[in-house]
Design a protein with these regions (language model features):
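Conserved beta-strand termini and adjacent loop/short-helix elements that scaffold enzyme active sites
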Residues: 101, 143-145, 170, 248-250, ...
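Residue-level "edge-of-site" marker
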Residues: 35, 69-70, 146, 173, ...
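Proline-centered loop/turn at the N-terminus of a beta-strand
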Residues: 12, 115, 139, 166, ...
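Soluble or luminal CAZymes and related metallo-dependent hydrolases
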Residues: 13, 48, 98, 172, ...
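Non-catalytic C-terminal accessory region of glycerolipid acyltransferases
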Residues: 135, 162, 174-293
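Membrane-anchoring hydrophobic helices of lipid-metabolizing enzymes
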Residues: 1-120, 164
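Short, flexible loop segments at the rims of nucleotide/cofactor-binding pockets, characterized by
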Residues: 92-98, 166-171, 209-210, 255
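Catalytic core of membrane glycerolipid acyltransferases/transacylases, capturing the structured
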Residues: 65-66, 112-172, 197-202
């Protein structure tokens, strides 16, 4: 079973250093400093490096040298997503630009007044996507694991302020299910990842990059139960200061067979996820063995 534990990397001191650089010198100097941090993880974070290296080498077929280079790039891109999150959420002056392919699809979901489910994965920068979704003019709910260490979470909240979306935290008591149900019943948008699960969660299986992999059942159960429109959304970084947000055409799964709906949704999601992984291979932040059964 995949061994992801829902915890993120980093230390409070590291965040403080980068926030200080951002406030005093700007984004590009912070990116420069990030090179050394990325190299540290590249050299000394064996477990996550092995999983990511195997993804480049075994799944995408890259040579050893290219896989190592892509591994370093992956750490550097991941660090940039954390920096960009702080910049955008805290209002630090920046020169970020954005393209938004499929915005009309999300506006159509809002217009339908049926609620909607936006599914993504740990590819690109979901925080940037959440920032852009504000302009849809409707309530946005983001479902997430509470994976930050408490000290880091408190510090980041102090720097950025509270998120401009409603956060629904996944909890062991399943109270998040009721919060999601209420949001959809109120015709709101619910955003969640559909590529990771914790031990004990129910799963569905699909071929992904040539090998069978497991995906969390929860997001697909919700869509099958509430029969709300679905769009697959990703925010990808295309240059140092430019993001490209993709939102697929809305899907409405009306089949009365719940299992058939979940399988069709999963296949649609996997197609979108594979497309983004192949187009932006360095931006899949998957630091565990995704295919381990």
């Amino acid at each position: 079973m995949p061994s992801w534990q829902g915890k993120s990397k980093g230390t409070p001191l590291g965040y403080r250093i980068f926030v200080s650089v951002l406030k005093n010198f700007g984004v590009m100097p912070a990116y420069f400093l990030l090179r050394f941090v990325a190299f540290h993880y590249f050299m000394f974070s064996y477990k996550s490096s092995k999983s990511t290296y195997d993804y480049f080498h075994k799944k995408l077929g890259y040579s050893t040298i290219r896989s190592l280079f892509k591994l370093y790039q992956n750490y550097h891109f991941f660090g940039q997503t954390l920096i960009d999150k702080v910049v955008v959420m805290s209002g630090i002056r920046n020169r970020f630009t954005f393209d938004f392919d499929g915005e009309e699809n999300l506006r159509k979901i809002v217009t339908l007044q049926k609620g909607g489910l936006l599914l993504s994965s740990h590819i690109g920068n979901w925080e940037i996507a959440g920032h852009l979704l504000k302009r849809l003019g409707t309530r946005i709910n983001v479902v997430m694991f509470d994976g930050e260490h408490q000290q880091i979470k408190e510090y980041i909240t102090g720097v950025t302020g509270e998120r401009n979306v409603n956060v629904i935290v996944i909890k062991n008591d399943l109270s998040h299910i009721y919060a999601i149900s209420e949001a959809l019943a109120n015709n709101e948008l619910v955003c969640m990842h559909a590529d990771r699960f914790l031990e004990g969660n129910k799963t569905l299986s699909s071929n992904f990059l040539g090998t069978e992999a497991k995906f969390p059942m929860g997001p697909f159960v919700l869509a099958a139960k509430f029969k709300v429109p679905v769009s697959y959304v990703f925010a990808m970084k295309e240059s140092s200061l430019h993001y490209h947000l993709f939102a697929s055409e809305l899907k409405e799964y009306t089949n009365t067979d719940k299992n058939a709906v979940m399988q069709q949704m999963l296949q649609d999601f996997v197609v979108e996820m594979e497309d983004k992984v192949k187009r932006y291979p360095e931006q899949w932040y998957n630091y565990y063995n995704f295919w381990q059964q």
